[in-house]
């Protein structure tokens, strides 16, 4: 958000940055559509075209991502297609679709934690991400998937404390 605002208001920064960058990549959380739009507007104003902006979906266990955007016309929430060599499994979970991974970049399990490892994988060896997805366009699966929240809304802080976001709504 800060870089989008700075690129709108700081001509020198915008010119310097966009004269050198050929792609933006971000991860960690989705950007809101107004931020995407602001970044695209700054790019088009300065260099007359959009710089490829990419993201994906992953976690430590998928080292680092499992799904990656390759489409040049990305919108907020788009995740993309599986990385080469990765298999996806889409599982209906009470009205949401969980994405699961199996492939060479997926962890074989948790160190000295056989119970947690067994819980993390399904009977076919797919890692259960807990992430919900939808097709970007159901008529063109080549565009890939978009984020649709979490199957389990609880998450763990770096301190080890679990947080339930349900009551925060």
Region annotations inferred by a language model:
Residues 35-38, 113, 167:
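Residues at alpha-helix caps and immediate loop-helix transition turns in enzyme cores, especially N-
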């Amino acid at each position: 958000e800060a870089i989008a605002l700075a690129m709108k208001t700081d001509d020198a920064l915008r010119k310097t940055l966009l004269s050198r960058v050929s792609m933006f990549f971000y991860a960690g959380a989705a950007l809101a559509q107004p931020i995407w739009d602001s970044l695209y507007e700054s790019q088009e104003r300065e260099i007359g075209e959009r710089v490829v902006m990419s993201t994906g979906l992953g976690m430590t266990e998928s080292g680092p991502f499992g799904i990656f955007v390759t489409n040049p016309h990305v919108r907020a929430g788009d995740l993309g297609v599986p990385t080469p060599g990765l298999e996806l499994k889409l599982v209906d979970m009470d009205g949401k679709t969980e994405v699961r991974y199996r492939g060479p970049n997926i962890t074989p399990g948790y160190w000295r934690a056989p119970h947690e490892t067994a819980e993390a994988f399904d009977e076919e060896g797919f890692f259960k991400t807990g992430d919900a997805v939808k097709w970007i366009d159901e008529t063109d699966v080549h565009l890939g998937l978009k984020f649709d929240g979490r199957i389990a809304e609880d998450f763990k802080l770096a301190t080890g404390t679990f947080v339930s976001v349900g009551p925060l709504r």
